[in-house]
Amino acid sequence: MKLYIMDACAMLALLRNEIGADVVADIINAANNNKLKIIMHKANLLEVYYDLVRSFEKSVADKILAEILNRPIEVNSEISDEIFLEAGYLKAKYKISFADSFALAQAKVSGGALITSDHHEFDIIEGKENIEFAWIR
C-alpha cells in the first residue's frame, strides 16, 4: 500500500483552499477508500494547530483540529531513535525547521512520499537524500 507523509503546508493548503488543495483532497479521499495510508508527525500537526490559533479564535482552531483528527491520517506522536537521529541529521545538514526535520525523517525512515509544497525548504534536499516528494504545486 502506498504511504504518504503529510507536511503541515499541505494540510494548510487544503484548509485554506489554496493551489494544491485538490491534490491533498484526492490523497485523503484515496485513504478514505483504503487505497493508501497517510501519516503525519505530531510536530507537523502542531504547526497546523498554531497557525489555526493565530488565524482564528482558539475554539475555532480546536474544532478544525478535531475535524483533521477525524480524517484518515495516522498521527505519529512517537520519536523513535531512528526518527530522532535522522531528524537531527537532516536539520543540521540542511538548516530546516524543527517540524520539517520530523516530516523529512518520517518520510525517509518509512519510505513514504512527503506531501508538501515547501519548495523553498526542500528543493535543495530533493535528489540528495533517499526521500520521495509528492509536490502539490
Predicted stretch roles:
Residues 6, 39-40, 78, 98, ...:
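Short beta-strand scaffold positions
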Residues 69-92:
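Acidic catalytic patch
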Residues 32-35, 72, 95, 111:
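Residue-level detector of structured alpha->beta connecting loops
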Residues 51-52, 73:
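Helix-loop "lid/cap" segments that line or gate small-molecule binding pockets
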Residues 12, 46-49, 88:
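Amphipathic alpha-helical segments within well-ordered protein domains
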Residues 10-11, 44-45, 83, 103, ...:
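Alpha-helix capping/helix-boundary segments
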Residues 1-3, 75-76, 104, 108-137:
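Acidic, PIN/NYN-like endoribonuclease modules and their adjacent C-terminal/linker elements
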Residues 1-40, 53-66:
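Short, well-structured N-terminal submotif of metal-dependent ribonuclease cores
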